[in-house]
Structure formats: structure tokens, C-alpha cells
């Protein structure tokens, strides 16, 4: 990505905002962010209070998990994309925000997601991941379809029939983990390894202490949850045995991928720890955040959209002789648009962090602001992707927003740590699984509407991803 000009074209303003009293103000902001207001309202409130989309903030979790929580936030589409400029933004150890888990969580290595592009190791590791996906692209559709059939739809139908509804979120981990494991591990079934049936549980236990400082589980009284999870980092020892089982399983089963790493000059041990980070954070956590939003939006849209989707999907597949192929999926413009719209409204990773590599000027829609070298920065993707100066009805789910001439707006879809019109490469920080995530989103819709004409949902809001219950399933009649 080319560097942005450092010559401001708009009036220069001081960055508004106030960090307040040391520690006390940051803790108040943390309670507002997690409990009193919620993430979305908190960021919108800062922009409204200071009449600016570039503002100073105390970023949660703050004290005492981090000493560096005084950030500048980019809250519109114009300022947010500066976070993608690798000549300006250093991403070293900023993936999780203002705190970072110890290296022991990753076998003593730093996964590529924590490495800046200036590090020579970045291109080698990112290139390895991209080439691994490319070599397995023919497996994406058949393996995912099998996982959907074996670990999602059969259980959905059974639970709806017997219990009156099915917890969609609860069924996802086994389905997504099984797909990921078979994809990366030479089609080995995870239950045939040391993991048995507990693979998703070991993975969730390992992920929990890495993610919980920046989340709210909403299962405990706020003051207890805050005390336990937002004031210090959980030691690795609590999840060491879970992680070791994952390491053992992938080391023994992902033979081809690890052989490929060695041919590229990457140590087998380093490759397996990078693979586990890819599996856990990028794929497992990302997909389990994305799919509930997708099914929620489609479910709430109702029968009219369902009929349109079913007609498009079934027609495209019929034209392919009844086969669900990549060629057929690529013809489904409404399906594509629905997936893009979901990723626009609810990006799986809502926050992008980094530190300024040098002094530069950042522009919002109406002003320029000086960013000093070393300043810690955060971009809030849901506000950037719902910028009212870019999108009409920005907070509404518009299924066909990106159809026809609407495709021109794809450059403003920013969920992948890059523009939708750009591609991941060894020299950038864009999500290596960008195309795979979109394909799986389309494929789950294809499978839904090949089986069912319509369905209804019941939604329970959570901190970020909703809990989705499937209430009814009407089987396909044509």
C-alpha cells in the first residue's frame, strides 16, 4: 500500500479528547466500554462528545494489564485506512491491543500476526501460509460441505424437531474445528488423534486467556468479571496441558504442511506454533464470530430474501448440472453481496492496532491531525465500515448493497485488515484467509437454501457476536 501524503489538504486541528485522571479515568472508561455502554455506544459517544472522528481515548482493558493505554482512535472510513499503511504503522506485538500474551503461549515464538512487515521473518511466514492455502484450495468445498452435513445440519434438524429450537452457536465449534483440522492435517479426523472429541474444548481453553482481557463474557456480575479478567493476564500454566495436546496433534497429523515449511527454510517447530495461531485466532475464533452474524442477518430478513437466495442458489447449481462448484458459487451475486454486507456491518475483528513509525498527518473527512512517532493508535472498524458519509443507510442490513453498480463500494469494505479490492500478500498485513472466509460464508448459505426454503431465528445479544437459536426450518419444496 502506498504511503499517504504528509502534506495536509484540510484544516489542521489538535486531536481532541482527554485522558483524564491517571488510572481512575481509565478504569471508568473500561466500565463504560464493557458494561455501562458497550463497545459500539462507547466509541460513538467519544466521537459525538468531541465532534471528531479522530480522538484521544483510554483504551480498554487499561490498568493493570497494560501501562500503555492512552491511544488515538480513528473512527471514520477516511482515517481508518491509515491503519493499513505499512510505511506509517508498526504492527509489532499490537494484534491484541494494549496487552500481549507471553511468548510461552506460542511455544516461545511470535506468530506472524504479531510481526511487522519490516521484520524479514514476516514475508517468509506469511508466504508459507498463503502457499499452504493455495495448495489446498480444491479441498475447501468438499471438506466444508462434509463438516456442515456431519456436524451442523443433522443436529440442527434433530434439535428443532425434538426441542423446538437449536442453539446454532453451540454447534459451530465442532463443525469449524473439524473442517480446519482436516484441511490442514491431510484430512485426518481430529477424533482419531490424541485430541479425541475434545479438540474444540482444548482450543477454547487456550484462546480464553488471550482474548478475555478485551472481551466481556457477561456471565458474572460486572465487578467480579472485571476484577478477574481485566486487571491482570492469566498465566499460561493454566492452559499449558491443553496447548500441548494441540501441539502434539498437529505435529503428528499436519505432515504435509510441516514438510512444506521445512522446504521453505522454516523450522518445523516454529511452523506448528504459527499453524496453531492461524487455527485458533484467525480461523476458529474468526469463523465462530462471523457465522452467527451471517445467519442472524439472513434469518431476520425473512422469507422474501430467503426466496431470492434460494432461487439464485438453485438456479446456479442446476446450470452446473446439479454440482456445488466454485464456478456455480461465483455466479451467485446476491449470495456474495449478503456475505460482504455481513462483513461490513460486523467485521470479525473490529479493532486494528498499531504504533506510528514516524510523524505523519492523518485526515478525517473534515480535518487533518498530526500523529507523533510512537503514538499508539486504534481503528474501530464497525464505525469506519458504517460511515454515513460513505454508505446510505449505513446501519441497516441491505442484502443487495454490493450488487451491480454497488460493487464499486467494495473498496470501503475493510474487515480483512485491508480493502476488499486488495489481496493478501507476504509484504502486507491483510488477512491470509480473506478469500477462504468469504467462500465459507457463501457456502453455508448455499447449503442452507439447498436444504430449506426458509427459517426463523431467535437472537440473544452478547458483547460482540449474538447467540442465534434456529426456531423453525422449512424444508425445500423445489
From Swiss-Prot:
- Which first-to-last residue range defines the signal peptide? none
GO terms for molecular function, please? colneleate synthase activity; heme binding; iron ion binding; monooxygenase activity; oxidoreductase activity, acting on paired donors, with incorporation or reduction of molecular oxygen
Q: Is the keyword rRNA processing in the record?
A: no
- Group of enzyme by EC: lyase
UniProt key word Ligase:
no
Could you tell me the EC number(s) of this protein?
4.2.1.121
Q: Which SUPFAM superfamilies match?
A: Cytochrome P450
Q: Which domain of life is it from?
A: Eukaryota
Q: Which organism is it from?
A: Capsicum annuum
The protein's matches in InterPro entries, at most eight in alphabetical order, are given as: Cyt_P450, Cyt_P450_E_grp-IV, Cyt_P450_sf
Q: Report the protein's function.
A: Involved in the biosynthesis of the anti-fungal toxins colneleic acid and colnelenic acid.
What's one Pfam family here?
A: p450
Q: Which UniProt keywords apply?
A: Heme, Iron, Lyase, Metal-binding
Q: List the protein's name.
A: 9-divinyl ether synthase
Q: Which family does it belong to?
A: Belongs to the cytochrome P450 family. 9-divinyl ether synthase subfamily.
Q: What is catalyzed by this enzyme?
A: (9S)-hydroperoxy-(10E,12Z)-octadecadienoate = colneleate + H2O
Amino acid at each position: 500500500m502506498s504511503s499517504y501524503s504528509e502534506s495536509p489538504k484540510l484544516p489542521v486541528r489538535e486531536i481532541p479528547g482527554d485522558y483524564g485522571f491517571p488510572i481512575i479515568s481509565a478504569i471508568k472508561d473500561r466500565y463504560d466500554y464493557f458494561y455501562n455502554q458497550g463497545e459500539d455506544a462507547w466509541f460513538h459517544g467519544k466521537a459525538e462528545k468531541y465532534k471528531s472522528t479522530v480522538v484521544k481515548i483510554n483504551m480498554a482493558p487499561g490498568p493493570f494489564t497494560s501501562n500503555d493505554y492512552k491511544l488515538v482512535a480513528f473512527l471514520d472510513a477516511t482515517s481508518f485506512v491509515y491503519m493499513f499503511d505499512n510505511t506509517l504503522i508498526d504492527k509489532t506485538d499490537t494484534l491484541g491491543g494494549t496487552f500481549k500474551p507471553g511468548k510461552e503461549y506460542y511455544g516461545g515464538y511470535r506468530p506472524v500476526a504479531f510481526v511487522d512487515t519490516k521484520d524479514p521473518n514476516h514475508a517468509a511466514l506469511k508466504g508459507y501460509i498463503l502457499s499452504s492455502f493455495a495448495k489446498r484450495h480444491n479441498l475447501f468445498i468438499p471438506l466444508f460441505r462434509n463438516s456442515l452435513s456431519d456436524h451442523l445440519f443433522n443436529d440442527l434438524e434433530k434439535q428443532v424437531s425434538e426441542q423446538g429450537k437449536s442453539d446454532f452457536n453451540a454447534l459451530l465449534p465442532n463443525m469449524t474445528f473439524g473442517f480446519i483440522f482436516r484441511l490442514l492435517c491431510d484430512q485426518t479426523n481430529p477424533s482419531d488423534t490424541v485430541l479425541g472429541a475434545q479438540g474444540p474444548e482444548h482450543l477454547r481453553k487456550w484462546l480464553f486467556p488471550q482474548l478475555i482481557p478485551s472481551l466481556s463474557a457477561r456471565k458474572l456480575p460486572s465487578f467480579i468479571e472485571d476484577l478477574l479478567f481485566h486487571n491482570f493476564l492469566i498465566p499460561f500454566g493454566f492452559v499449558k496441558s491443553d496447548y500441548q495436546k494441540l501441539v502434539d496433534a498437529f505435529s503428528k497429523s499436519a505432515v504435509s504442511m510441516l514438510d512444506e515449511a521445512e522446504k521453505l527454510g522454516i523450522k518445523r517447530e516454529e511452523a506448528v506454533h504459527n499453524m496453531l495461531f492461524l487455527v485458533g485466532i484467525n480461523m476458529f475464533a474468526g469463523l465462530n464470530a462471523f457465522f452467527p452474524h451471517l445467519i442472524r442477518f439472513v434469518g431476520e430478513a425473512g422469507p422474501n430474501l430467503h426466496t431470492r437466495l434460494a432461487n439464485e442458489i438453485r438456479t446456479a447449481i442446476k446450470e452446473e448440472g446439479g454440482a456445488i462448484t466454485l464456478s456455480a458459487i461465483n455466479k451467485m451475486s446476491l449470495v456474495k453481496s449478503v456475505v460482504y454486507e455481513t462483513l461490513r456491518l460486523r467485521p470479525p475483528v473490529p479493532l486494528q492496532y498499531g504504533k506510528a513509525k514516524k510523524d505523519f498527518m492523518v485526515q478525517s473527512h473534515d480535518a487533518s491531525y498530526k500523529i507523533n512517532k510512537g503514538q499508539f493508535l486504534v481503528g474501530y472498524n464497525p464505525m469506519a465500515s458504517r460511515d454515513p458519509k460513505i454508505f446510505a443507510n449505513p446501519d441497516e442490513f441491505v442484502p443487495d448493497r454490493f450488487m451491480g453498480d454497488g460493487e464499486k463500494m467494495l473498496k470501503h469494505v475493510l474487515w480483512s485488515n485491508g480493502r476488499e479490492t486488495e489481496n493478501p500478500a507476504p509484504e502486507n498485513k491483510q488477512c491470509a484467509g480473506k478469500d477462504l472466509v468469504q467462500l465459507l460464508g457463501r457456502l453455508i448459505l448455499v447449503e442452507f437454501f439447498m436444504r430449506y426454503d426458509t427459517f426463523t431465528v431467535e437472537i440473544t445479544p452478547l458483547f460482540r457476536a449474538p447467540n442465534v437459536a434456529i426456531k423453525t426450518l422449512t424444508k425445500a419444496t423445489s
